[in-house]
Amino acid sequence: MRILLAVDGSPSATRARDLVVSLPWPAGSVVRVVAALDVAPALWGGPWIPAIPAGADEYEADALRELTSVIEDARAPLEAAGLAVETDLLRGAPAFAIPDDAKLWKPDLTVVGSRGHGPVESALLGSVSSAVVDHAETPVLVARGDHVRSILLAEDGSPAGMSARDLVLGWSPLAGIPIRVVGVVDVAAPWRTGIAPTMFSAAMDLYTEMITSSRETYGQVIAATVATFQAAGRTAEGELREGDPADQLVRAVHDNAGDLIVIGSRGHTGLSRIVMGSVAHSVLLHARCSVLVVKLPHQPHHPR
């Protein structure tokens, strides 16, 4: 497999590196360690500042030395874990430089920390991590911990949800880790205010019918996914929740002390949605564990 790891020397990036080290990658796996150097935001802050401020060269040289050291610090534990490592120092804003590098290198997985810091431009701020997730064409792991001992899989039966399921099922680094398959029924209840009693009664009847149908549908989807994992020899169980999808997914991982949420980047829309882009984004913002966002590829994506 090919893993792209973005670092910046922050504790979050260190956890991301340690998470990569902790997983059992297949033989021949390669990790590309990158950092992004963008001095422009720190050096040019307004029209009154000269085009090339005094000390700009020294400032850039210092930043270059620091990020080079950060990259080399990440190399040693990865190589000690038996991984082949290559490195590069990217130029440009991290939110663009990292996805652009991923498009050229074509990793099976991009790994970033959830927050970052740096002397020049923060390489892995929450907003930057979000941008990497938005622009990457392959799965992105946003690391908040340094290990994975349990997985929560968001399931709604959508193509993106099935891509997430297939990844968990097929990727050897995730083999042997217990899985909780969670679906969320999200049907908006009617408001009584401003509705005539007879209309409200009809709306409630429709709501009851829809939520009953959704419970049955999601229950079947969850059961089928659990059966698929169990048939492959995996430990898996299902859980059906009701409410706001993002909120319930975050609560589910908290209630079960999960280490990783795996979620499709897009899912069903409408009243029965669960894994929409907005849901994945909200989970990224609020989950306290690592989040693996799986894209729906234009073509099948197979780890090398």
Please give the residue ranges for each predicted region.
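Small/aliphatic-rich secondary-structure junction motif
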Residues: M1-A54, A81-E86, V148-T208, T228-E239, ...
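Gly/Ser-rich helix-loop-strand patches that form or flank binding pockets
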Residues: R2, R17, S22, P26, ...
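Short alpha-helical
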Residues: P11, A93-F96, P119, S127, ...
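Structural beta-alpha unit
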Residues: S12, S22, D38-P41, A54-A61, ...
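Hydrophobic alpha-helical membrane-association signature
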Residues: A16, V70, A160, A164, ...
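A short acidic, glycine-rich active-site loop
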Residues: P53-S69, A202-Q220
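A generic structural signal for short
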Residues: D62-A63, E86-T87, H117-G118, D156-G157, ...
